[in-house]
Amino acid sequence: MSGQLASYKQEFLKAAIEGGVLKFGSFELKSKRISPYFFNAGEFHTAHLAGAISSAFAKTIIDAQQNAGLDFDIIFGPAYKGIPLCSAITIKLGEISPQNLDTVSYSFDRKEAKDHGEGGNIVGASLKGKKILIVDDVITAGTAKREAIDKIRKEGGIVAGIVVALDRKEKLPAADGDDSKPGPSAIGELRKEYGIPIFAILTLDDIIAGMKSFASDDDIKRTEEYRQKYKATD
């Protein structure tokens, strides 16, 4: 794969393709756009793939600490896909950097508040007064991340940033349905709205750079055309 990508990005991309997480073809998205590729993080359910995604997340987080000043106390995974992610990533961070990250905790939310036992919406470490790093698979419209940020703030936590597996670098659908208009991405809007850093293991640019060593010319061409048509302004 492309030497332009960091080794952990190459390894993650390879695992995603071999595991059927990243597929090429023709896929209708919620936006009704027809995408030449599809990323389904729900397929990271085997031991090998769970290890691959948690390792890639951990290395992305450590890279952001070293190069972008990211600082956090707790890994937060929004229900549902974020739940296994936050626990696996926390374990992996402690394994990779025990001298610096073995005290990192994790938390996740419930879709519905529990009214017995310990009660509440949050499971895991208390968020109050802590710097919280949200982890999830992708950001589509940003609605779920806004809900997570709201929950964290209500619990007294401070949102330090967000890390996702994939940044499609794709503009949001236009309100009037005219996709020829320029526009921002969901990630760009969240950065602007909340003033928080958002990082990704892979971007669409990374996928295109990497796929040149394994994909067909037709898949590469269609993916590049899709990027050109729907690329965000941010």
UniProtKB/Swiss-Prot annotation:
5-phospho-alpha-D-ribose 1-diphosphate binds at residues 30, 80-81, 110-111, 114, 116, 136-144. The keyword Ribonucleoprotein does not apply. CDD domains: PRTases_typeI. Orotate binds at residues 38-39, 140, 168. Its EC number is 2.4.2.10. GO terms for molecular function: orotate phosphoribosyltransferase activity. It catalyses: orotidine 5'-phosphate + diphosphate = orotate + 5-phospho-alpha-D-ribose 1-diphosphate. Pfam families: Pribosyltran. GO terms for biological process: 'de novo' pyrimidine nucleobase biosynthetic process; 'de novo' UMP biosynthetic process; pyrimidine ribonucleoside biosynthetic process. Pathway: Pyrimidine metabolism; UMP biosynthesis via de novo pathway; UMP from orotate: step 1/2. The keyword Transferase applies. SUPFAM superfamilies: PRTase-like. PROSITE patterns: PUR_PYR_PR_TRANSFER. Keywords: Glycosyltransferase, Pyrimidine biosynthesis, Transferase. It comes from the Eukaryota. GO terms for cellular component: cytoplasm. It is an enzyme of class 2 (transferase). Gene3D superfamilies: 3.40.50.2020. Catalyzes the transfer of a ribosyl phosphate group from 5-phosphoribose 1-diphosphate to orotate, leading to the formation of orotidine monophosphate (OMP). Homodimer. Belongs to the purine/pyrimidine phosphoribosyltransferase family. PyrE subfamily. This is Orotate phosphoribosyltransferase. It comes from Metarhizium anisopliae (Entomophthora anisopliae).
